[in-house]
From Swiss-Prot:
Domain of life, source organism: Archaea
Name the UniProt record assigns to this protein: Uncharacterized protein AF_0829
Amino acid sequence: MNLEELKPSKLITFLYHPDELLRFKAAEVLGRKVKGEGARNFILRLFWHLSDESGAYCIGAPLGIAEIGRNNPEVFEGFKNKYVSLLDDWEVERKYVAYGIGRAAEIVRDAYPNPVEKLREKVEEIGDASFIAYAIFALKVLGDDVSDMIARFRKSEEIVEFYDGSEMVRTKLSDLLVEVAED
């Protein structure tokens, strides 16, 4: 199936998909297709799908919000604080928020709460290897010195699945951090 051929309203359904790779790919295509006032409306819709009131929680919504936002910076400027604050919502897939912060780093860099401080706080609080991987990715893109985190987790044997921009990579957290250190 070619996601590029689908309308944005159909692409959103893939943000719910059990295949994680499809969630990432659908979010990227959604970000390229949705522009202007439509971008604002889609971002609002995806935030709605993260709330209990919607009755249709969407696990991939943070990915869609970030991709639409990074391709529509003038629109996302009004949502950046709310987006970074999603890190405080335990019901949201926070590794996707961390990834999205990395993808939209140029826009969220000056958000409140401070994304660097919030990501570092959540690494301590959450402790999940997948979240740590995406958080370190985002911190690095934000220009933070992550050498302390790389040193801290360099011996981790925990296996993570990480989206590298084209596919899901299954590797040890320590091996992934070696790659981050070399970038």
